[in-house]
């Protein structure tokens, strides 16, 4: 270990920055975040530093560096493009035992400034010892994604209760366990979900009622898993997936996402395949209630977004009636994910000024929709769960005035490495789907925007599964074929 990691208190303490350019500005900004008293010595200042001087946020010595400038400084940073001057500042500070940093010259540094994650009062510093600042920034960005901004406010809450808890629990070991139980459970989760007042109430109650939070009731996390690609999960979704005691998941959640769930969590498959519901919806609702009443943290994991054809409303309605705490985490809905990964913008000023989401789910062999509304021009219609009802969808749209040549796309396993896009028309799509043995999950997009797929498609999976189609000058499909199978239709 070439550098010892340490955090310095610089509030109201005198620090010196040698240099007045953009590099010096970055260092001044860091010092000001720590509430240091900053003096800049430089014949000239960049506009941003000049603005700070104008409002007395920094002191400026408008001249060259002099040895006496380091007197009474607790920290010095050399940020000039004069290597001889930088070296002189370093040697001078070293002789006087003043911590010194020379930008981009680690061999001249008594200390280095790491790449930082600021969740004040929480701070995380990442350093490569000056060997690779770029790598340090990359590592910081990865770590940063796992530390929500609310952790800073949570730390401030804990700080506010430290003395009170210490007085109530004088034993060090018992006090540690108290904080562990709270921060690994209800207080943190309430805080992260924006219920900060409830978090304070829980903390107060824990202090008043025997200090034990193990009898706290469970909670349900209704989480949207997105369309399939794990990289499209939200930070909050991933955090709750790692926290859950039990997971109730559907068929539409991709295996790659299931792999990210906490390893020792109990897994309950709820099914939701067409006509094969392992658990009826009412039983799922009651299952969530029962598990939460057992004190478990229950992850209800759904493909896409739980409030878009996901029956999330039905589930939380039951939870509300039973008084079960819950939180809802939105996911990228299949329409947004599959369209984006297929190069099909759902709205476009030249083609569509509206987009409609509809369910293509069959009920008693038919699809009960407002077909007149869906047949309106200059809009895009997206059908969820429409594979089995595809012939009915095409027939009804044409019967209500939509041209048989209207472009149509079917996206299979969208956003994953197995994504396949079949492009045709209302007239041709039913036969194309038969030829390519399409399997769910699928999404259907109807509208002029589908014409843009061939030009805008950007996502190229490891194996090219795109079914290409060629449009005539009138927008009609004249040929469709799979690049993997060589079939034609």
From Swiss-Prot:
Residues 1-203 are annotated as: Precorrin-2 dehydrogenase /sirohydrochlorin ferrochelatase. It comes from Thioalkalivibrio sulfidiphilus (strain HL-EbGR7). Pfam families: CysG_dimeriser, NAD_binding_7, Sirohm_synth_M, TP_methylase. Then it catalyzes the NAD-dependent ring dehydrogenation of precorrin-2 to yield sirohydrochlorin. Finally, it catalyzes the ferrochelation of sirohydrochlorin to yield siroheme. S-adenosyl-L-methionine binds at residues 227, 303-305, 308, 333-334, 385, 414. The gene is cysG. One of its GO terms (biological process) is siroheme biosynthetic process. NAD(+) binds at residues 22-23, 43-44. This is Siroheme synthase. It catalyses: uroporphyrinogen III + 2 S-adenosyl-L-methionine = precorrin-2 + 2 S-adenosyl-L-homocysteine + H(+); precorrin-2 + NAD(+) = sirohydrochlorin + NADH + 2 H(+); siroheme + 2 H(+) = sirohydrochlorin + Fe(2+).
């Amino acid at each position: 270990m070439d550098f010892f990691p340490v955090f310095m208190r610089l509030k109201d303490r005198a620090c010196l920055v040698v240099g007045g350019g953009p590099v010096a500005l970055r260092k001044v900004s860091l010092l000001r975040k720590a509430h240091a008293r900053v003096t800049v010595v430089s014949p000239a200042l960049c506009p941003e530093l000049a603005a700070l001087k104008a409002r007395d946020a920094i002191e400026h010595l408008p001249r060259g560096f002099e040895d006496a400038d380091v007197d009474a400084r607790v920290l010095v940073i050399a940020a000039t493009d004069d290597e001889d001057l930088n070296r002189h500042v370093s040697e001078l500070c070293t002789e006087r035992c003043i911590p010194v940093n020379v930008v981009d010259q680690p061999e001249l540094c008594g200390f280095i400034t790491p790449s930082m994650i600021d969740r004040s009062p929480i701070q995380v510093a990442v350093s490569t010892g000056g060997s690779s600042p770029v790598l340090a920034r990359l590592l910081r960005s990865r770590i940063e994604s796992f530390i929500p901004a609310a952790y800073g406010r949570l730390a401030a809450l804990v700080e506010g209760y430290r003395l009170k808890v210490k007085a109530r629990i004088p034993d060090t070991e018992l006090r540690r366990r108290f904080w562990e139980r709270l921060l690994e459970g209800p207080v943190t989760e309430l805080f992260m979900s924006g219920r900060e007042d409830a978090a304070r109430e829980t903390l107060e109650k824990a202090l008043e009622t025997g200090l034990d939070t193990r009898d706290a009731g469970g909670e349900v996390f209704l989480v949207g898993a997105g369309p399939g690609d794990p990289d499209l999960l939200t930070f909050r979704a991933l955090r709750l997936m790692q926290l859950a005691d039990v997971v109730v998941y559907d068929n539409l959640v991709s295996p790659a996402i299931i792999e990210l769930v906490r390893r020792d969590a109990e897994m309950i498959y709820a099914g939701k395949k067409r006509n094969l519901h392992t658990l009826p919806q009412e039983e799922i609702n009651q299952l969530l209630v029962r598990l939460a009443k057992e004190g478990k943290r229950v992850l209800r994991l759904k493909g896409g977004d739980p409030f878009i054809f996901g029956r999330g409303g039905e589930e939380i309605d039951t939870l509300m009636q039973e008084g079960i705490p819950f939180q809802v985490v939105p996911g990228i809905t299949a329409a947004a994910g599959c369209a984006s990964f297929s190069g099909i913008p759902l709205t476009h000023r030249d083609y569509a000024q509206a987009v409609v989401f509809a369910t293509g789910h069959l009920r008693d062999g038919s699809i009960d929709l407002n077909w007149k509304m869906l047949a309106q021009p200059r809009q895009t219609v997206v059908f969820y769960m429409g594979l089995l009802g595809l012939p009915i969808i095409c027939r009804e749209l044409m019967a209500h005035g939509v041209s048989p040549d209207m472009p149509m796309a079917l996206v299979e396993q969208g956003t994953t490495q197995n994504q396949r896009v079949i492009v045709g028309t209302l007239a041709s799509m039913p036969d194309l789907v038969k030829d390519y043995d399409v399997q769910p999950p699928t999404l259907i997009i109807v509208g002029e925007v589908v014409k843009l797929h061939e030009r805008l498609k950007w996502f190229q999976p490891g194996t090219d599964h795109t079914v290409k189609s060629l449009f005539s000058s009138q927008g009609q499909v004249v040929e469709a074929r799979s690049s993997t199978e060589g079939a034609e239709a």
